[in-house]
Structures are given as C-alpha cells and as structure tokens.
Amino acid sequence: MSSTRTNIFKQMEKVNNSSKVSSQRVLNPNSIKDALLRWVQNRLEGYPNVSITNFSSSWADGMAFCALIHRFAPDAFDFEKLDPKNRRQNFELAFKVAEEHGICPLLEVDDMILMGDRPDWKCVFTYVQSFYKQFRDYP
C-alpha cells in the first residue's frame, strides 16, 4: 500500500474514532445553552457591573454586551467610563463595536430598550453565539 493511501486510512480512522466519542456525549439544547453561559461567565469574570446568570436580565442594561466585546477589543473604548443607567448608549456602543469586529447585527437597540429588564433570552442567546463563533479561539 502506498504511504498516501495509508495516511488516508489513518485520517479516516481518526474521524471514526472521534465520532464514537462524540456520539457518547450527546449535546442537547440545555447543555449547549449552559456551555455558552459558562463560556461568557469565564470571559467576563472581573468586569465591574456585570454579573452573568442567564441570557435575559443579565444583559438588560447593555453592560454585559459592552464587556463581551471589550474583552476581545479592549482598545475600542474605555469600559470603566460606562454607566449601567445609560442603557441606550451601552447597546449602541456594544452593537457598533461588535459589528466592526465581524459580529452580525442581530439585535436592535430599540428592541432591547422596549424589552426592558427581561430581554427575550432566545434573541440574546443567538446574538451571543455569534460572539462565540467569532472569538472562541481567542484566549
């Protein structure tokens, strides 16, 4: 057998073995949601005025969105100058900087303002997934 064919078989074996492992660990919607929540919590640990416990109320003042994009674009703005009471300004800043860094604008500032203290968790979750996809390989 040629070495090329041998390498192809080795690669196929790796794929087959990895699929056996992944099939043993079934991902369901709740485990995916929990994993993304943990990813965000780890990235935002230590940010003032940011406490991530869910994909709804934790994001209502815009500070979490600002912290998340600031984590990956720290030179874009001074996080310390932000005020949780300035919701509109926080959303505008976070969404603008996120878009400049490759995150699709899936949320609208006016919608977030209208949702008040309890944004739709599915909307926030979907938007935060975009951050994960864009920045998952960053330390």
Labelled PLM ranges:
Residues M1-S58, A67-P139:
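Long, intrinsically disordered low-complexity tracts enriched in Pro/Ser with mixed acidic/basic residues
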Residues D61:
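Active-site nucleotide-donor binding segment shared across nucleotidyl transfer reactions
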